[in-house]
C-alpha cells in the first residue's frame, strides 16, 4: 500500500477520497466491518491506477461513471454501518467532494438508483444514531451539497434533506446543534431562493446572520459562545465552496436573452419549481396543529415556529420574482396568508412575533400585489392588539408597537397605507385606526377602569406609542421632502441626526431587506391624483356616516344615503347595499326589512326575491336566507319576512309543498326549534317527536313525511342557524362600533379568543373559509387596484386624520410625564408635526402644535418650570430656525416665548429693567439701580417681580397683574432655582433666531416682521411691566434685512413703518423718542444706499417721519423729527432722491406748527437746502420741486414772524433765479436738442431749447402756481410781496418761456389770482393747450382784495401783457375780460383798478390792436355791463315781498318794529348792492367814454356800434331804475329805518345820459362818416327828446297825474321840494341837450324840429330851478327857430 502522502493516486478525486478511506480502514472494527475494509482497500488500489478522464455523464469529476460507482461504494457502506468512528471520515469525505464541486448532477426522487441520491439519502439517514458530532457533520455535508453549484437537489430529495435538518433542530439536545440546524436551514433557504430569483445555479450567495435568527426564538438555547460557533460553522461551509476551482461546465444555463423565464420545461424552471415546492411545504409545516386530544405538543409548536422563521428568511430575502411571477405571488396569497390566518388564533408569543415580522416584510416588499390581504391582516394582527387597552398582552402589544415603528422607517409605506385603505371605499381605515389606537395606548386605560398592566408596563406602552406616533409624523415629513424634490431634506437637521438615515434602499440592503419593488401589476396611474383620492375619501366618509346612521335608525340612514346619492332610490339598489355593504348591523337590517312602510316593504320583497332557492331543501334555504341579517324581535315583522320567504321558496321550488302556507308555518317552526335547541336558558329541549307532532297537518291538512321533518330537525339541532359573521367564540368586550363599521367583526372574533395556555389549536375552519371568500370577492373589484401617489397634497388628508390624536398624545404625555426621554420624544413629535403642517400650509393644525409647544414652555408661569419646559424652549428655537420659512402667523407664539425668556433671564441677572423707558417720574438714581441679582440676594417685593413669581395664563399679555398680596420666600426661592434652568439657553441662541431672519424667504420674513410688531406692541402696552425688547429686535432685523432686493424690502418696510408710526404716536414720550431715534439710525443706514431715478423707496422709508410729524401731539417728538430729518439730509444729501418728498412734507408740517422754535428750526434747514443744495432737489422728479415750493409757501403762512414769511417768498424768487440761470441746464447734457421757434430774436439756442423740455416746464409750474396762491393771503404784506415776486419773475424770465407755456401761465397762474375779486373761472376752460396740471387750474378765493392790491395786480398784469404782447397776444380777449371783471366787481377798489388798467392797456397797445382786437375789448366791456345788469335785477326782485308805503299808515312808515329781521337784512343788502351796482355801471360808462375819446381815430363803425349799445343799455337801465317809484319808496324807507344814505339813482341816470349824449354829439360832429353810416344823428335826437321828456316830467304835471288829483287841466301848481331838487339835478343835462340842438346843422334841425318843437314849448311853460335852462332855450329859439322862420 502506498504512503499516506500518495493515497488515492494521481486523480483529483483520489486525493480527496484516498485519505478518508484510509481513515475508515483504521477506525473500522476488523471483524465487524470486514467487507467494508476490503472494499476500501480495493478502491484505494483502483485509485492508484486511475487517471483523470473527463466524463460529462459521470457524477464524479475526472472519473467514468463505472469508476465513480466503484469509488463511492465504500462511502455508502461506511454510512450504513451506524458506527460513528467510520461515519465521521465518510461524512468528511462527502463534505470535501461537495465543497470542491467534484460531485455533480441532478438529484431527485425520480431516479432513486442514482449514486448521488443514494449518497444524500445515506447521509440524511445517519442522523438517527443520536451522536451530536455526527449531527453537526451531517448538517455540514447537507449544506455543502446544497451550496454546490454542480448539484441540483430537487423535489422530494430536497424536502428530505430539509426535513433531516428540521429533525436535528427539533430532536436535538445540544443547544449548539439546534442553532446550527436552524442556521443551516436558513442558509439553505437563502441558497435555494436566491437561485430561484436568478434562475441560475451560479447566483451570488449571501451568508446567513445567526444572531438575527435568534432575535425572536431560541434565545434560551444559546449556550456560551454558541452563536459565534454556529456563525463560524456556516461561514466555513460557504467559503469552502467558494474555494472550488471554476467549473468546466454549467449545470443550469440561464435563459437566453429574450426567452421566457417561465417555461414549463428546462433546467431553469426546475430551480423555481424546487423553490415553489419548498415554500409550499414550509407553509404546510407551519399550519400543522395539535389534535384535540394532545394539545400540549411542544415539538409541534417548535416545528411551526421554525417553519415560520424559515418563511420569514425567504420573504425577507425575496426579490422581484415574488411579484412578477404569478405563481410565487399566489403562493404568498394562498399559502403564506393561510398560514398566518390559521396561526393567528395562537397565543404563543414567538409565533405571533414571527407573524408580525413576516407581515412587516409583506407590507414593505409585496404590498402592491397584496392589497386585499393587507386589508384583512392589518386589523387582525395589528389593530386588534393595538386597540386592546384594558387587557393587553404586554409582549404582544410591544411586538405590535415595534412593528408599527419599524414600518414607519419606510415613508412610502405609511403613505401607501393611507391612500389604498383610508381612501378606498371598500377598505378599512387602517391609518386612522393606527393613529387612534396609538392615542388610546398613549393615554392609557380610562380612569376608573381595571387593567392587568403593571404601572411600569403602562408607562412603557405610553412611551412606545408616542414613539410610534413620532415615527409616523416623521415618515410623513420625510416623504413630503422627497416629493418636493428638495436638494437637502426639509426635515430639521438636528432631527435628522437623532434617527437613522432615511435612505431606506441603502439601510435595507444592509439588513437583508429591500423596499417594495417597482413592479406593480395593479397600479392605476389615473387614480394617483390627490384630487381623485380626496373625492374617494370624501365619498367614503359620507358613506360611513350613512352606515353609522343606519345602525342607529335604519330608515333615517337609508334616506340619508339616498339623498346624498350614495345609494340609488330603487328597492333593488337598496337591497344591493344591504347585502354587500360591510359594517351594517344585522339586527338593524332585520328591523328595516320588517318595517310596514311602503318603501321598506318594497325593499324587503326585493331582498327576498334576490335569493335563488332552486334545488335547495327547506333547511338549507332558510339557513342561506338568514345568514345576512338577524330576525327582529317583533312578531309582526318576523311574520312579514317569513311570509315573503315562504312565497319565494315555493316559487323557486313549486313541487315542494302544496301551498306557500305550508312553507310559512314550517319556517316558523324551524325558527322556534333553533331557539329552543341552542338557547342555554331553555332547560327542557324539544324532542324530534315533539317537532313532528307540532307540524302535523300543515300541508293543506296533510302531514309532511316524518323522515323529512326528522332530517330537518337533525340539521337544526346539530348545526345552529346563524349569521355568516357569527362565531362560536364570544365577542370581546373591547369590540367597538368601528370594527362593525369596517366589517371586521367576523375576522376579529377568531383572534379575541383568550387562551391561558399555549395550545397549538388553529383558527375555526368555517371562519377561515369565510375570510378566503372575502379575499376572492375583493380581488375582483376595481378598488383592489393598488395606487401610488406623488402629490404631496395627500398629506393634507393624512394630517386632518392624525393631527388631533397626535396633538393629544404629545400634549398629555408631555404634561403628565416628567421623564426626560418621554419629553424629548414628544418634543420631537411636535417638531415633525410643525414641519409637516407648516410646509403643507395647514394653518390651523400648525398653529395648534406651535401653540401647544409654546404653552409647554411654562414661561408664563416660571415658578413651576421644569427641565422638560426648558427642552420645550429649545425645541421652539429649533423650529424657528429650521421651519421659519413656513411658520407664517405662528411666528407670534414663538417670538412671544423668546420675549419671555429674555425677560426672565434679565430678572435673574438683576439687569436694569425697561421701566426706565416708561416711568418718567423716577429719579435717575432709581433708574440706575434696576432689580437686585435674584440669584444672589433674593427678590424684593417689587410689583413686577411679584407678578412674575405668581405667574399667569399663557394667553394673558401680562403675568399675574391683578393678583394681590406678597409672594412668599419659598416661592421666590423656587423661582430663582427655576431661573437657573434657563442658563441652558444662551443669548446667542435667542439672537440667532433674529439674525437668521435674513435667510428667510420673502413671505416668511414678511410674516416674521408682522408677528414681531405684534409682540412688540403687546410688550409696550403691558400695564404692569412694559418692555422694549422686541422693539429693539425690530430695529435689528431691519438692519439684517436691509440688503434684500427692493421689492421685498418695501413689503417689510410697509409693516415696520406702520408699526413705527403707531409707536411714535404713543403717549409714552420716552418710547416715542426711542422709536424715532431708532428710525433715524435705520434711515441713515438706508440712505447710504444709492437710489436710481424714478424709484420711491426712500420716500416710503421716510414716510413714518411724515405721519408722526403730522399726527403727533408732542412738541418734543415733532422737534426731534425735524432735527432727525435735518441731520439725515445734510449728511446724506448726495444720496437723497425720492426721499426729498418726505423731507419737504416734514418741513411743510413743521412750517404750520404751533411752536415757534419748530418753525424756525425747520426753516433754517430749508434755507440751507435751497441755498446750497438746490441742484440736488431739481435732479429728481418734478414733484420734488413741487413739494419744495409747497413747503416754502407754507412757511409764508407762518404767523410767528413776518420775516419767515417774507424770506420764504424771497426763496421762491431765488428758486426762480436758479431755474432761469441754468440750474437745470446741466441735467439736459446729452439730450438731443431739437430746433424750436424762438420767442424773441435775441435768445441763445440753449435758452430756446431750455423750455422745450417737459421736465423744465414741470419745474416752473409749482413755483409760479405757488406764488399765485399766495396772492390770496389774508395778510396784505404777503399778498403784495407775492404779487410783486410773481410778476417780476414772469417779467424777468418770461423771455425763456414758449408760447404754449405762456398760455399755461395765464390760465393757471395769472387768472386764478383775480378770482377773489372776479368770482368766475370761465377763463380757465378756454385754453385747452395748457401745460399746467389740473390741480393748479383753480384758485381758492380766500380773501377779498383791497383797492391797493387790486390796483397792483391789474397794473402788473398790464405791464406783463404789454411787455410780452407779441408772444401772448392770443390772451388779449381773456385779459380784457378779466379787467372787465374787475370793473364789475362789487367793491370800488377793484373797479377803479380795472378801469385804470384797461385804459392803460388801450393806451399802450391801442395803435397795435387790430379791428377784431378792439372789438373784443368793447364786447368784453359790454358783457361786463350786461352781466351786471342781469344779476342786479335778480337782486331787486327780492324787494317784492316788502310792503310799499301805500299799504302803510303814516306812523308805520318809519316804524321798524313792524318789519321782521329777514326783511331788514334784505333791505340792507339791496341798498348796498344798488350803490355798488351804480358805481360799476358808471365805471363802465367812463371806460367806454374814455376809450372812444382817446382812440376815436382808430375805431371803426363796428366798434362805435358796440359803444353805443353799451351806453344805450346802461342809460335805459338807469332811467328804468330811477323811474320805478315803488322801488324808490321802498329804498327810501329802508334807508330811513337803517339810517343809510340813499343810492344816487338820479345821479346815475343823469351821468349815463350825459355821457351817452356826449358820445353821440362827438360822433356827429367829429366823425360824419361813421355818423352817416350808423345814423347816429337820429339816435342823438332820440336821446335828446328822452332827456327833455324826463325833465318836463318833473317840472310839469302830465294828464294822468291831473286826473288823479281831479284838478282842472289848465291849472298850474307850484313844484314840490323833491321835484325842484330833481329839476335842479337835471338842468345841466337839459342845457347840454339844448346846446346840442343849437349846434345842429340847419337841415338837420329843420328835419327834426316837428318832433321836439312841442317839447321846447313845454319847456317855456315849465318852472325851472335853474336860470341857465331858460337862457339856453331862448338861444335855441332865437338862433335855430328864428332862422328857420326867416326862410
UniProtKB/Swiss-Prot annotation:
| Active-site residues, as the UniProt record annotates them | 634
Q: Where is the composition biased (Polar residues)?
A: 1232-1248
User: Where is region (Disordered) located?
Assistant: 494-529, 1229-1248
Name-wise, this protein is Brefeldin A-inhibited guanine nucleotide-exchange protein 1
Q: In the record, what terms sit under GO molecular function?
A: guanyl-nucleotide exchange factor activity
Its Gene Ontology cellular component terms are:
chloroplast; cytosol; membrane
One GO-annotated biological process of the protein: regulation of ARF protein signal transduction
* Major localization listed first in the record, in broad terms: cytoplasm
Disulfide connectivity for this sequence is: none
